[in-house]
Amino acid sequence: IDFPADYGLEYVVLDEGWSDPKAGDVMSVVEQIDLPELVRYADAKGVGLMLWVVGNVLDAKLEEACSYYAGLGIRGFKVDFIDRDDQKAVELVYRLARVAAAHRLVLDIHGVYKPTGQNRTYPNIVNFESVFGLEELKWSNPDMPLYDVTFPFIRMVQGPVDYTPGAYRNATREGFRIDYRNPMSQGTRAHQVAAYVVFDAPLVMLCDSPTRYMADEACTRFIASLPVVFDTTRVLAGEIGEYIVTARKRQDCWYVGGLT
């Protein structure tokens, strides 16, 4: 909480571990976490808390959970593992959005099918994963720089994308290795920074640890200063699988990012 407060970041997501995974109950908070105190502390620092939760677990007590956690001061949910795109999944997403909106909660939906405009109907859906994001490098070895200059031309046509960029342990293809507990990215740090401009993400993560971010103050301050909503977006140049250069304007300031 102190880290985002120092860098002017709006939210912290309490990821897996705040609730009892064996209980399968969104209302079951582990005894080691004092959620009301965390909310109080975060509010005092100007930071909002969001909770990660499995989609069907939230749905099982949707009204109760949204009412309780909104009353507690939680700002929203990062919903995960929908993992299907049939009618039931679509109905689930709309149901989650509708009830969350009634309680003024935002949603970042992971493990979900490609967006189809739900965020127009429910603007409280601030982002969708629906992409082979950076977390995949924890357990696999794909060519991520190639992927990064491919999916913006395809997937981003349908809506914003929560790719979770911001890795500060950067490696060449030859130096990269799979490391679940101490993960690294492929490509340069500049590549990671440029992703914050190129990838459309009204809610965007910083995926690495605060200690790594604090070790590169200038780079981290720059990322933290970037807007997440822009007035104008222009793709200046690009070729699928080769490169993309994007310029985005907020008020009177232009931001330009390029990936190869």
Please tell me what each predicted stretch does.
Residues G8-L14:
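Core alpha-helical transmembrane segments of integral membrane proteins
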Residues I240-T260:
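Carbohydrate-binding surface patches
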Residues A190-L236:
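Catalytic cores of secreted or luminal carbohydrate-active enzymes
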Residues I1-Y7:
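An acidic-aromatic substrate-binding cleft motif
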Residues L107, V198, V256:
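Hydrophobic, well-ordered secondary-structure elements that form the walls
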Residues V30-P36, R40, V228-G241:
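Extended hydrophobic/aromatic segments used for targeting, binding, or gating
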Residues E10, R75, V204:
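Short acidic/polar active-site loop segments enriched in Thr and Asp
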Residues D15-T188:
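Aromatic- and carboxylate-enriched substrate-binding clefts and catalytic-loop regions
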